[in-house]
Amino acid sequence: MKTLTSAQVRQMFLDFFKEKGHAVEPSASLIPHEDPSLLWINSGVATLKKYFDGRVVPENPRICNAQKSIRTNDIENVGKTARHHTFFEMLGNFSIGDYFKEEAIEWAWEFLTDQKWIGFDPERLSVTVHPEDDEAYELWSKKIGIPEERIIRLEGNFWDIGEGPSGPNTEIFYDRGEDYGNDPSDPELYPGGENERYLEVWNLVFSEFNHNPDGTYTPLPKKNIDTGMGLERMVSVIQDAKTNYDTDLFMPIIKATEAISGEKYGTSAEKDTAFKVVADHIRTAAFAVGDGALPSNEGRGYVIRRLLRRAVRYAKSININRPFMYELVPVVADIMAAFYGEVKEKADFIAKVIKTEEERFHETLHEGLAILSEVIQKEKAKGNRIISGEDVFKLYDTYGFPVELTEEYAEDEGMEVDHEGFEREMDKQRERARQARQDVGSMQVQGGALRDIMTESEFIGYSDIKTETKIAELLQDGELVDLVQEGQKVQFILEKTPFYAESGGQIGDKGWVKSGDAAIRVTDVKKAPNGQHLHEGIVESGAIKKGMSVTAEVTERLRKDIVKNHTATHLLHQALKDVLGTHVNQAGSLVTDSRLRFDFSHFGQVTKEELEQIETKVNEKIWASIPVQIDLKPIAEAKAMGAMALFGEKYGDIVRVVQVGDYSIELCGGCHVRNTAEIGLFKIVSESGIGAGTRRIEAVTGQGAYEEMNAKLELLEQAAEVLKTNVKEVPKRIEALQSDLKDAQRENESLLAKLGNKEAGEILEKVKEIDGIKLLAEKVNAKDMNHLRTMVDDLKAKLGSAVIVLGAVQNEKVNISAGVTKDLIERGFHAGKLVKQVAEACGGGGGGRPDMAQAGGKQPERLAEALASAEEWVKSVL
């Protein structure tokens, strides 16, 4: 057998099938496109469903690929077994109605055994087939010549990944030899059994059926071939590696982790698990973030968050207690650069996202673990083995512990978690969120007469804001009527309308519909269930009848402000990509007459300097007086032009393309200015985070921007008046006041230190001696934890050799600090353990180093009793 690198194996596979007339399909993004049945691309065939189910005919019916994939159904096993992964590569060859079983089997055998290619010893290969697949059995037996004892019929040889193609399959196994198993009594020691000797290297699926969304199976238009070879497993065989992790796909990551941790891979099972978890999870996170997924509390983002936090948890067992995963991104990029250049191209961005997520978790990890430890001890004391759903939810909601992470920590302590209770708490949170949201009168809940209205209505509002028309339908309280009187609310549909209906983030128009003395003030416009523009308003005068001729007019001032904000939103979207990076994508928007709001994907806060750059770029495009061109185009042509489409948005064959010069091009159905100069001015008023990986910018344009800047100038003038200076001197005046304040604070701290030293001197008289160990455990007056730690340090210096624990009450909360001198640390005394015991005795928790530690408590009335427990603790150490 040849010695090959993973990159050589991957390329060799593609080259082989290229020689067999296959087109090489590029690896698709891990984020599925138009496939709601999948969270991630989880196989090579998952990206080719459109070909297999007959929706699209490929240019070449023979296809091969190397497809990056993610599966998360058994994360808890990753790191603990030889071959479980969350990220992996699947090599595959596919036939869309071209060749079938005979060629698939012959070529698989050729690739594996021919010396030009992999060059396996044929005697080491066995195969499995479905019990009813006699054709495959005969091909292996008679065409290839495999002895019957190495052809095993297995009931499980039927491949099904959910919605999509499926059918019987045959698997090829490599015998690694007796070193990996030689017990004839082992019931699993056979190709297809659970063992390490016979490794599956290739799965050939004879795809004949489509698994429909309703669970039924129907014959595919043509018989197809779908094969899958796991690159990691294949490489482990070729490189004679004990596990997949001992190959060149993982070892550089493990070596880098060794350098960070100071620990060695291969010294213990526990440490090896940690190294494997880190190596697997950084591959997944790097590729997922590179493809546009960001850490969050739901969907794909939750998977990334869970994996990174699981890696942090395991890294602690190899002495890594700081953010470090981001340092491994360049290692992953180098390993995969030959075929997946995207990780190397986006390495800085990926590392920044991962570092931000790690830092966020480390901020709460220590406190969360203390709470979890407290919960576990509390339940154990009660004789319980289950952590309540309420406690699991608190750790999830407050400290960012994915429930699966809590479960793993609990498992280490012989505990379980209450999943049902956790889900109940999650449901309560979702309900609270639903109740907190404003009722926006969603069209989805409207029914009755509206659903049955099929009357046609033409929208002319792109070009006209006023028109003569007729009232086609009248509704009141959801029912069709013929007449609505003055003072009553009304809904109506016009034969043609200039009023824009709320969609794409743009609000509906306001205005008037009049006929003689009768008038309706239009307050909102939405789309009815069958697509007509449904106007809502109040009859301000006269009576409105169905069929009457009316004049419909949009309020021009409001429409003009709306279009300014909408075009500015497009400019903002592109400016964000220019300044922050191409990873930025729209996550939501709101365009009103008074302001615009734009939500976008980004991993961290946008800096002041970045906001200034973004604002400047938008204004430069406004002042450049760029024409805005709007065209209807076939969607393929629009995308070829580079038009940005909203992820998940459904588009027809013909789309509306809004183009601002050569700067911005988007698919959009909204209303826009004709030239950017009409916008006048753009001003960002706020930037904030609205969820993990999602930021929000609010901005104003035109007159609104002018008023915003005037309001800020007025505030500055008021500040100058209060500071008794002019506007230009305000910063200097504030700096002078800050300097005076710092001087006063230093003087105050000096006085407090003197008082603290005085108190510290007084409590020296309260030192106890226990079998030669000096102990000082007292309640003191300290303004905060820093003050308390300073007192402990001073007392350690004065006493020379002592165990010290001090407590103070501030705003009904307890602060505790403990210190142990170096000589007593060597005798087994540990400040972190002492402070933990004292804190738990007054309803809190904490910890720290052997020489210095701190904690908090919630029951100030028990502080004296808690401090008294220090004496027993000292005796227990002795």
From Swiss-Prot:
PROSITE patterns for this protein: AA_TRNA_LIGASE_II_ALA
Molecular function as annotated in GO: alanine-tRNA ligase activity; aminoacyl-tRNA deacylase activity; ATP binding; catalytic activity, acting on a protein; transferase activity; tRNA binding; zinc ion binding
Gene Ontology biological process terms from the UniProt entry: alanyl-tRNA aminoacylation
Catalytic activity: tRNA(Ala) + L-alanine + ATP = L-alanyl-tRNA(Ala) + AMP + diphosphate
Principal EC category: ligase
CC cofactor note: Binds 1 zinc ion per subunit.
Protein name, UniProt field: Alanine--tRNA ligase
Keywords: Aminoacyl-tRNA synthetase, ATP-binding, Cytoplasm, Ligase, Metal-binding, Nucleotide-binding, Protein biosynthesis, RNA-binding, tRNA-binding, Zinc
NCBIfam families to which the protein is assigned, alphabetical: alaS (TIGR00344)
HAMAP family cross-referenced by the UniProt entry: Ala_tRNA_synth_B
Family matches, as Gene3D superfamilies: 2.40.30.130, 3.10.310.40, 3.30.54.20, 6.10.250.550, Bira Bifunctional Protein, Domain 2 (3.30.930.10), Threonyl-trna Synthetase, Chain A, domain 2 (3.30.980.10)
Family note: Belongs to the class-II aminoacyl-tRNA synthetase family.
Cofactor(s) demanded: Zn(2+)
Entry keyword annotation includes Oxidoreductase: no
Domain-related comment: Consists of three domains; the N-terminal catalytic domain, the editing domain and the C-terminal C-Ala domain. The editing domain removes incorrectly charged amino acids, while the C-Ala domain, along with tRNA(Ala), serves as a bridge to cooperatively bring together the editing and aminoacylation centers thus stimulating deacylation of misacylated tRNAs.
Gene name of the encoded protein: alaS
